[in-house]
Swiss-Prot record:
This is Pyridoxal kinase PdxY. InterPro entries: PM/HMP-P_kinase-1 (IPR013749), PyrdxlKinase (IPR004625), Pyridoxal_kinase_PdxY (IPR023685), Ribokinase-like (IPR029056). Disulfide bonds: none annotated. It comes from the Bacteria.
């Protein structure tokens, strides 16, 4: 399995490719990592050093990869935070190049726009880029509840609201190949206190998975869930199984992180959770 992952990179900690690449490699995937930035640490610390790469830099790296003649072997493209319109455009150009070489390749887009309580935290114009250009190109989307609501204009108070919003979003996605949406964090009227729901949609079917809500809010968790879900969907061909495997692994990762009181997810220390999760969760038809 070969996955082209175009995301940010940090020297210290685990966000973007620094969160996604190691679990994917541990599970057996070859990862072709293209970094959109190289920072000392994630921006949640308030200060950092490093470089932001431009769209031309990404295009040059993609040309080099294409020159090796390997794009027909690429099974999927994974993208997350897009730092600028130029980077977003270069990522979508990369998706087009991969699909030209392998029409069966999937594009998994984590539409990083914002979050409940924080609102939109990306640059002006990027939410619209996701909505108008990335979503119509994607086979797999992994929004959180805030992003689902923003992309569709539907407020999700109940599970029925969330299902309706997901169907609206699915209609905006690519027509060729699968159309899969994973809502990575959902809290609606039916969600018990102290719990967190995840909702996945494929082929007209919805599955809900519920875990305890852990006392941790940490950068990089969304990058990990998107990468793991993509891997397991490629591996099993089934969104329900992919959700169960990815959610179980990330729960174990975050539980270990919370117990340690760490400011960074313990991607390496908790590596066994990616292979054999200590707690397994199962999704139900909803």
């Amino acid at each position: 399995m070969n996955i082209l992952s175009i995301q940010s990179w940090v020297c210290y900690g685990h966000v973007g490719n620094a969160s996604a690449v190691f679990p994917l490699q541990l599970l057996g995937a070859e990862v072709w990592a293209v970094n959109t930035v190289q920072f000392s640490n994630h921006t949640g610390y308030g200060d950092w050093t490093g470089q932001v790469f431009g769209g031309d830099d990404i295009a040059a790296l993609m040309k080099g990869i294409a020159d090796r003649g390997v794009l027909p072997r690429c099974d999927a493209v994974l993208s997350g935070y897009m730092g600028s319109d130029a980077i977003g455009g270069a990522i979508l150009d990369a998706v087009a190049s991969v699909r030209a070489a392998n029409p069966e390749a999937l594009y998994c887009c984590d539409p990083v726009i914002g979050d409940t309580g924080r609102g939109i935290f990306v640059r002006p114009g990027l939410p619209e880029l996701f909505r108008d250009r990335a979503v119509p190109t994607a086979n797999i989307l992994t929004p959180n509840q805030f992003e689902l609501e923003w992309l569709t204009g539907h407020h999700c108070r109940t599970l029925a609201d969330a299902r309706a919003a997901v169907k609206v979003l699915a209609e905006s996605m690519i027509r060729q190949g699968p159309r899969i949406i994973l809502v990575t964090s959902l809290h609606v009227a039916e969600t018990p206190s102290g719990s967190l729901d995840m909702l996945v949609y494929e082929n007209g079917r919805f599955y809900l998975l519920r875990t305890p809500l852990l006392p941790v809010s940490i950068n990089g968790a969304g990058d990990a869930i998107a990468a793991l879900f993509l891997f397991h969907r490629l591996d099993t061909g089934d969104a329900r199984q992919a959700l169960e495997k990815a959610a179980s692994s990330v729960y174990g990762l975050l539980k270990r992180t919370a117990e340690a009181g760490s400011m960074e997810i313990l991607t390496v220390a908790a590596r066994q959770e990616f292979l054999t999760p200590s707690t397994c969760f199962y999704a139900q038809i909803c």
